[in-house]
Amino acid sequence: MNLPSTKVSWAAVTLLLLLLLLPPALLSSGAAAQPLPDCCRQKTCSCRLYELLHGAGNHAAGILTLGKRRSGPPGLQGRLQRLLQASGNHAAGILTMGRRAGAEPAPRPCLGRRCSAPAAASVAPGGQSGI
């Protein structure tokens, strides 16, 4: 009687070993008894990630919803974060973000000797004057 030969991929073996060896390593006394950093204890810095990983509560829910929260930092960073997390055309949103800020583009300086206001308006995109 011949048994069917089964080939086990290296990825499956590696995953199985990680699942068997990783939890005991994480639960060891050295990993579980990490001291709280001074800045977190004194509240002099932001320790949201440290609190999610080591604090009390549902860590999985906190980590899984960390990227979906809308309370981003104000200003340009917050708008960029909202653009990256929103659905739609991200490239178009990022490329037009500066134009939507409400500021008019700065006028280009005139580099020629015979530069006047009407001539500056007739400058071609390549930088050559149309006059």
UniProtKB/Swiss-Prot annotation:
- Where Pyrrolidone carboxylic acid occurs, the residues are Q34
What changing L16R does, per the record, is: In NRCLP1; early-onset; impaired trafficking and processing
Residue positions of the PTM Leucine amide?
Answer: L66
Using the record's annotations, give every residue carrying the modification Methionine amide: M97
Propeptide residue interval(s): 98-131
Q: Which residues form the signal peptide?
A: 1-33
For this UniProt entry, the molecular function terms from Gene Ontology, in alphabetical order, are: neuropeptide hormone activity; type 1 orexin receptor binding; type 2 orexin receptor binding
What Pfam families does the record point to? Orexin (PF02072)
Q: Which GO terms describe its biological process?
A: chemical synaptic transmission; eating behavior; excitatory postsynaptic potential; negative regulation of DNA replication; negative regulation of potassium ion transport; negative regulation of transmission of nerve impulse; neuropeptide signaling pathway; phospholipase C-activating G protein-coupled receptor signaling pathway
Q: What disease is recorded for this protein?
A: Narcolepsy 1: Neurological disabling sleep disorder, characterized by excessive daytime sleepiness, sleep fragmentation, symptoms of abnormal rapid-eye-movement (REM) sleep, cataplexy, hypnagogic hallucinations, and sleep paralysis. Cataplexy is a sudden loss of muscle tone triggered by emotions, which is the most valuable clinical feature used to diagnose narcolepsy. Human narcolepsy is primarily a sporadically occurring disorder but familial clustering has been observed.
Write the protein's name. Hypocretin neuropeptide precursor
